Amino acid sequence: MGSGYQLLQLPRERFRKTSFLVWVIILFQRAISMPLGIVTNSTLKATEIDQLVCRDKLSSTSQLKSVGLNLEGNGIATDVPSATKRWGFRSGVPPKVVSYEAGEWAENCYNLEIKKSDGSECLPLPPDGVRGFPRCRYVHKVQGTGPCPGDLAFHKNGAFFLYDRLASTVIYRGTTFAEGVVAFLILSEPKKHFWKATPAHEPVNTTDDSTSYYMTLTLSYEMSNFGGNESNTLFKVDNHTYVQLDRPHTPQFLVQLNETLRRNNRLSNSTGRLTWTLDPKIEPDVGEWAFWETKKTFPNNFMEKTCISKFYQPTPTTPQIRARRELSKEKLATTHPPTTPSWFQRIPLQWFQCSLQDGQRKCRPKV
């Protein structure tokens, strides 16, 4: 045992030399910020990428591209009963609308027409220029009633409702939307030698019908007590045949359910309403919840901070900032151009004028 122990034990002098070498490597790494391990040309740390993009490459806000990102990528439940629980009514909060340049193709979109018990509408009509989200695989069209305890329907998690290149904080009546957020991509300025070859331009067939390139399937629902704690959702197969939805499900499951009822002659054969209930043994999660389910584990949704904060400096937060909501119409007219609708909020980004001086690029804000 003793000799075996001596074999495993590092001699005192060698231990001192080894520990000294380790400390030298650690201090050396911290001093010059070189990652431990084999350093090659492909070794690039996240902080270096951040500095490369943010410090050296952003010379003009023309390099910023605003994009709409769907919440489906975070793995949220997309069935109607689950989705409607993320929306709620509030009063006294003005709606905000911002534009974005590009977006994703959505797997699930929604279209709501909800009335109060007295027959009045719960949701406002969309402002001029607001059109439905153009790329949806499934459109969940919901009609029904609810208490609607408030003037406008907002997202409880602070997300946007994405329409056609416009994102709003509220839901508009009869207008297809996807849930999402608006983010900025920073595009590096292209070098001149990138454009030596003539770029290939593919012919684009422009059309006013933005949904003509993509197969969209509309699924209809009927909902009662929309916006309440206990809402009831029915999947509409035809005008007289419905299915009670009592647990989360995928749109692919509803498509199969619709085909099964029709193929087996399970539709209502009278003018009365026939409502089916799901067998508890049936698995309603056929297909996919969303096309990027692996992002479910991402924490802190809507709280991501990027280097864009270095360039976009909002107005300092003061107690008077709330008073901006009560500004008179005359003051608002000086804030926005006359051609800008009152519901459209421009994103206040600073433009830069850049020039080369002594071989260095120098930028200053445009006046």
From Swiss-Prot:
S-S bridge residues: 109-136, 122-148
Protein name: Pre-small/secreted glycoprotein
Gene label: GP
Keyword Transmembrane helix: no
Molecular functions per Gene Ontology: channel activity
Family stated for the protein in its record: Belongs to the filoviruses glycoprotein family.
Record organism: Reston ebolavirus (strain Reston-89)
Transmembrane segments: none
Marked site (Cleavage) residue numbers: 325-326
Pfam families, sorted: Filo_glycop (PF01611)
Residues bearing glycans: 41, 205, 229, 239, 258, 269
